[in-house]
Amino acid sequence: MSISSREESEGMTKSCDVGSLPFPGESDTFLEGATRYTAGIDDVSTELFEQEVARAFLDKLKAGIEIPAFPQFRDMNDMFLSALKGLEKMTEGYVETGTLTLKQGREMLPEVAVIRRNADRFHLEMGKPFQLRVCVTGPYTLASLFPYKNSQTYTQLGRVLSEVVEKNVFAVKQGEVVLVSVDEPLFGVVDDPLIDRGTDGREDLLAAWESIMGRVKKRDVETCIHLHRTTDELFWEVESLGVVESHVDDPLYEMKATRGWLERKDKLLKASVATTDFDRLIKEKLGLNATGDAVADIWKKIAKGILSPEMYLEDVGLMKKRLEDTVERFGVERVAMAGTECGLRGFPTYGSAIECLRRVSEATWQ
C-alpha cells in the first residue's frame, strides 16, 4: 500500500517518526530478550522485551503518529551486524572472515515480530488498522565499522539486508508495513575515497541500495533513505527510492535544486519539522548564555527532577511553520510525510520523547 493513498478525511501529509526512544527500564534483561524472542523462548527476558516494544509502539500510535517506526531501543548497528555469520568483532571493528550470511532464525527483526504478534491489540485499542515503518541500517553506515572494507563489502551487506527487508514486510487486516527506510546517517558526512566518482565502490554502493529498495518495491511498499547530509547526490540515482529525508537544517529543504531533483527522479520528501539534538534544544533556550557548563547544569537539573525536559522542546507552532515552508517550496504533492529529523534516543526521558511525537502529530494535522 502506498503511503500517498489516503482517505478523504485524512490530511495530505502523514506524520511519522524515525524510530529510537530512550529506554525506560532495565536494559540488560531487555537486550537478552531481543536475542531470544524470535527463537520462541518464553522467559522473563522475552516477556520484558515484548512488553516494552508493544507499549512503546502503542504510545506512538496514541501520540497521533500515523506511520510510526518500530520502537528502536537497541544499537542501530549491532542489531544487524550481530545477526550475521562471516564476521568477527575485533578491537578495531568488524572483520570479514567469510561470505556474509544471516544466522539461522535471525531473519525476522524481533521488534517487528512483536508488532505483528500484537496486531490484534493495536487494532482494538486504536479502532483502525495501523501502518508501520521498518528501519534498517544501510550498507554504507554498517561498512563504516569494517576497518578493511572494500567495494564488495557494500555488495555483501546489500545482499543480506535485502533478505532482511523481505522477511520483515507484512500485511494483515489489523495493520501493515507501508514504509521501509534505509538509514545512512554517515553517508556524505566525510570525504570517502572508496566512493569517489568513477570508483567501483560508488557503483557497488548504488547497486546495494537498489537491491534493498528494489526488494521492498516488489512488495508494493514505499521506500525511504534517512540521511544527515545530502551534499553527495548519489542517492538520487536509486530508481527504487521513493522518499528522501534529512535533518532540519540540511540545505536539501532550502535549495531550489531539490525541486528539480524531485521532479526529474519522481521522488517525495519527508519534511523534518522537529530538532532531535537535545543539547541544541537547550542551547536555543539559553540563548547567549549557552556555555558548555550551562548546558551540563541543565542536564543535571533534569536528571534530579528540578527541571522538566518538556520545557526545552520546540513548540507546535515552529514545527507547523517548518512544514508549511517545505510544502510551499516544493508543493504538497511532493511532501508525503512530516516528522522528527532523527531518532529520540538522546532525549532525557521517555515521556519527553513521546511528547515531542505528540507535538509533531499536532503540527502535521493543523
Which residue stretches match the model-derived regions?
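Short amphipathic alpha-helices and their capping/turn segments at secondary-structure boundaries
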Residues: 53-64, 111-128, 162-177, 256-264, ...
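Active-site-proximal, glycine-rich beta->alpha crossover segments in alpha/beta enzymes
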Residues: 85-170
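N-terminal basic, low-complexity leaders that serve as flexible interaction/assembly modules and, when applicable
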Residues: 1-87, 154, 220-222, 326-328, ...
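Alpha-helix-loop-beta-strand connector modules within alpha/beta enzyme cores
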Residues: 102-124, 200-220, 357-366
